[in-house]
Amino acid sequence: MSDFLLSFSDRLSYDRYDEVTVGILLSSDPSTRIAIEAKVDTGSRFCIFQPHYAFLLGFDLEKGVKVNIRTAAGSFIAYGHEVTLTVSDIEWDTLVYFAEMENFPVNVLGRGGFLDHLRIGLVDYEQLLYINPYDET
């Protein structure tokens, strides 16, 4: 039997009757910070947010990096912008996307922009998400 040891700096809890949802902060500059609740989605390639957050952060939505995102239910257009993303006390600069659709239903924390910056542990039975900044050591 192999022993694997992981350590985490933070532990976040989420609601038993909801998806794995965490509170984050997005900022476009030091004076603009927005609190957002978002779903952790290991199947999503990108972090994708509802479009009104782009406007609250001062972005011109369509001046971002345009991508066509495909899902099992169809596809949609989103625009990428550089932000500072904060979860707990962990912070980094990254590219996230804002959906073009006004009625985009959910904010998503995917592999690119979120999970690729963290080591995570999930104990769903206890509704706990353990996180630590990713480093190569």
Across the structure, where does each feature detected by a protein language model lie?
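Pepsin/retropepsin-fold aspartyl endopeptidases
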Residues: 1-137
